């Protein structure tokens, strides 16, 4: 479509985001509720956005700025560090580590090749293909059996077994506070809105019911800290689109069901893994094929 081509070339919008944040934090030994995790994501996101802008600026010097650059905040001399919600500094005090003022001058002089650069996508399919954790989300279990049109897909978290005790699992989180804070640190620097998710485990509430006050608190906190939008509200009900293998000793799980939804218990023994319901061979294959995660990821050194 010619009109779409004209608009696309005029703005050259990009949406670059994260895949495997849970793995990144597990390698650092941080849980989603740890302040060090929030500080790490703050540091990572600042460098992430800075170098996206720097690369786009260098492309603008080489190929010219995008036609509609003048319609962006960047053309007005504004950077993400200028207009984020300052309440986020209550979580992690603001600290500039990058040469933002030098970059501001370069952008004012040469512009940017792209009108937008960063966005956080769900990345469900990409994560499966690359055997990474899903976007910025905590995994629901160490081993998941995901349904698809071509049959069940077994996926184990990266770095297992070395990192199995360092992962934050979704339904183990005491609250959404850590996740909300992490998304807030990202939104501080990202130039497009992030649609975050809220997750509730009724087993952690009185009478196994999630009170409206808890949901209202999360919504207002997210708004206060700079969230623009939210997407899923997940509730743990022992069913869903994924069949999950839960770590032993965490909570009761449904082992058998009359329908297609089945959740199985993952049990750790001294001599390795054993999975009830006859899944042991499948788990052993995943265990063997999942390489040791001894190296330090490049992002960890930022």
Language-model features: where?
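Extended, hydrophobic alpha-helical segments in both membrane/secreted and soluble proteins
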Residues: 17-20, 52-56, 215-218
């Amino acid at each position: 479509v010619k009109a779409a081509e004209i608009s696309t070339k005029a703005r050259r919008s990009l949406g670059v985001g994260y895949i495997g944040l849970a793995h990144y934090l597990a390698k650092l030994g941080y849980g989603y509720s740890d302040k060090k995790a929030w500080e790490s994501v703050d540091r990572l996101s600042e460098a992430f956005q800075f170098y996206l802008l720097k690369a786009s600026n260098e492309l603008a010097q080489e190929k010219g700025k995008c036609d509609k650059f003048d319609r962006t905040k960047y053309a007005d001399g504004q950077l993400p560090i200028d207009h984020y919600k300052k309440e986020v500094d209550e979580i992690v005090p603001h600290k500039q580590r990058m040469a933002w003022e030098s970059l501001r001058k370069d952008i004012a002089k040469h512009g940017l090749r792209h009108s937008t650069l960063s966005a956080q996508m769900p990345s469900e399919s990409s994560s499966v293909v690359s055997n990474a954790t899903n976007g910025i989300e905590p995994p629901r279990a160490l081993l998941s059996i995901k349904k698809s049109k071509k049959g069940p897909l077994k996926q184990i978290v990266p770095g297992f077994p070395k990192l199995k005790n360092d992962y934050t699992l979704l339904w183990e989180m005491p609250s959404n506070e850590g996740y909300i804070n992490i998304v807030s640190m990202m939104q501080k620097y990202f130039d497009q809105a992030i649609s975050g998710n809220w997750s509730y485990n009724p087993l952690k509430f009185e009478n196994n019911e999630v009170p409206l006050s808890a949901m209202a608190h999360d919504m207002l906190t997210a708004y206060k800290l700079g969230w623009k939008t939210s997407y899923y509200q997940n509730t743990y009900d022992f069913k869903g689109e994924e069949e999950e293998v839960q770590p032993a000793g965490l909570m009761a799980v449904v082992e058998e069901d009359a329908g297609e939804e089945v959740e199985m218990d993952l049990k750790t023994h001294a001599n390795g893994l054993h999975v009830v319901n006859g899944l042991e061979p499948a788990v052993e294959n995943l265990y063997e094929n999942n390489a040791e995660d001894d190296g330090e990821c490049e992002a960890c050194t930022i």
